[in-house]
Regions:
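Short, solvent-exposed alpha-helical surface patches in non-cytosolic proteins
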Residues: 49, 71, 112-113, 154
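Secondary-structure boundary elements
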Residues: 85-140
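Active-site nucleophilic cysteine motif
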Residues: 106, 110, 144-159
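Extracellular adhesion/carbohydrate-binding repeat motifs centered on closely spaced tryptophans
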Residues: 2-88, 126, 177-188, 192, ...
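Conserved aromatic
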Residues: 9, 52, 98-100, 142
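Active-site rim recognition segments
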Residues: 127, 135-139, 189-241
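Hydrophobic/aromatic-rich core segments of domains that either
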Residues: 153-219
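Repeated polar recognition positions within modular binding domains
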Residues: 112, 116-124, 141-143, 180-183, ...
């Protein structure tokens, strides 16, 4: 009996060579194809907007696009976030830092720029809640002045659009040994798996100290932490918990 041997070779089929429409993941990068061709720029998919760079790669957790077309923040799933406070934060970052610099350098530049805003105690509020953070941040971005809670809230948005996890913390503080702790709020940013403080309002009052990205243990003043609110963004929507 004669056996006929057939030599069959398989060549790899890439996403752009198929007729499929949908998401494709290759080498840890995410793409979207329409009729087998990868897309770039903005794309509306299932009522949400996503941004693909010139290499067709989905961009995540960063500021994207251009000065001409406008800058936007996209969350960790790549969805464009349109909350007003996020838009203000993006504008602040683009105005006060350079895209050519490292993320940490940009955060530092933005921290210093925010510290130049006027400290203003024109409110009776001595506390902060999850529902008030967005309004506090919006006020600071619009009016360029605020108290400790407004500094903290706006910086939390700034840190997030730069790709950091961020939260707003409320408690008490004093720079004087025998004084009672005064109500206080500050921002914390997660870097190298550690939450670190960024305290704009106290930095304004104590220019000789470094209150940028310091641990609570290294913070030079007496401090009490009562509660923390972490920013969460999912599907383009911002919530605080």
């Amino acid at each position: 009996m004669a056996v006929l041997l057939l030599s069959i070779s398989y060549s790899p089929v890439f996403a752009e060579e198929t007729d499929d429409t949908g998401w494709v993941t290759e080498n840890s990068n995410t793409y979207y194809t329409v009729n087998g061709k990868r897309v770039k720029g903005w794309r509306k998919i299932d009522k949400k907007y996503y941004y693909f760079d010139t290499n067709y790669i989905l961009q995540k957790n960063k500021i994207v696009d251009s000065k001409k077309k406008g800058y936007y923040y996209v969350d960790r799933s790549g969805v464009r976030v349109t909350a007003p406070e996020i838009k203000y934060a993006v504008s602040f970052v683009m105005k006060n830092s350079s895209p050519k610099d490292s993320r940490s350098k940009r955060l530092r530049d933005c921290f210093e720029a925010l510290c130049k805003y006027q400290y203003y105690r024109g409110w009776l509020d001595n506390d902060i809640s999850a529902v008030s953070i967005s309004a506090y941040a919006k006020y600071m971005f619009q009016n360029h002045r605020g108290n400790c809670y407004r500094y903290a809230s706006s910086l939390a948005y700034i840190a997030r659009v730069l790709g950091y996890d961020s939260r707003v913390v409320a408690g008490g503080v004093t720079a004087y040994a025998y004084n009672n702790l005064s109500p206080h709020g500050w921002c914390e940013v997660k870097t190298e798996n550690t939450w670190k403080m960024c305290d704009c309002s106290m930095q304004n009052a104590h220019r000789d100290r470094n209150l940028f990205l310091v641990t609570r243990k290294a913070y030079p003043f007496r401090l009490r932490c009562d509660k923390a609110f972490t920013m969460n963004i999912k599907g383009g929507k911002v919530t605080w918990k």
